[in-house]
Each structure stands twice: as C-alpha cells, then as structure tokens.
A protein has these predicted regions:
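Conserved catalytic or regulatory cores that recognize and/or transform ribose-phosphate-containing ligands
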Residues: 1-132
C-alpha cells in the first residue's frame, strides 16, 4: 500500500473539529492508500520563516520535495472549503499547473478541482472559488 502525503488546505479560522471531520471523511472515502495528512497551518509554521514570503511558501507546498528525494512532498492537495483565500487559491493554481491532484470536500461531496475563479470582491480571505 502506497503512502501519500496530503496537504490539507483550510482557512486560518477553521476550527480544529471541522478540519478533523474533513480528514476523517477523506480517510473513509479513499481508503485504498495510506495517507499522512499535514494541515496547512503546520506546514506554514514549519516553513514560512525559512522561505521568507507567501509566494515562496505557496510554491513550496506544490513543488517542494521530500528530504533526500526528488519526490514532491505532497501528492494531493485537499481543500475543505469551496470559497478560499488568496494563499489557497495560489496553491491550487500551482497544483493544477503542476498536475497535482486537488480534491475538494464541499457539503459532504468529494470532487476534483479543475479551476480557480476570482470572485467580485477584494476579500483576501474569501475572494476565490474552486471549480470542479
């Protein structure tokens, strides 16, 4: 059974129970592999200072490699909100460009994200919508 690292993209203000419930649903739905889930807030805490800016961190989520290998550190980007902020929108856009699978859980339904749409707002926290 392969182990797949999954980046959990969530809003900064999502509560831990909401995030955990989404991870449990993912595990139940996609049980053929072993998964290691890394919350966005943990990756951000571990890497942002070293990388120096948001753009570098967003790219590192998608293009960064596992230590000592050429394998990307995340095989799946898992989004738990359809409406997202700028950082998640950028991560998803990089992932789509790189061919990394992006999975969305929205109202209990899983789908594969195909695009990111900018909404008619200047809200950096909720100004983009994921399209399946």
């Amino acid at each position: 059974m392969a182990t797949v690292n999954v980046f959990v993209a969530h809003a900064k203000d999502d509560n831990d129970d909401f995030i955990e419930q989404a991870v449990v649903k993912f595990k139940l739905r996609f049980s053929k592999n072993q998964y290691v889930f890394v919350l966005g807030k943990f990756d951000h805490t571990q890497n942002m200072k070293r990388l120096g800016n948001w753009d570098a961190w967003e790219k590192n989520v998608v293009y960064g490699t596992r230590y000592g290998t050429t394998e990307r550190k995340y095989g799946i980007i898992f989004c738990i909100n359809r409406v997202v902020g700028k950082a998640t929108a950028n991560i998803v856009q990089h992932a789509l460009t790189a061919g990394t699978k992006v999975v969305l859980l929205d109202d209990g339904v899983f789908s594969v994200v195909k695009a990111v749409q900018k909404l008619e707002t200047d809200d950096w926290k909720r100004g983009w919508m994921l399209q399946a």
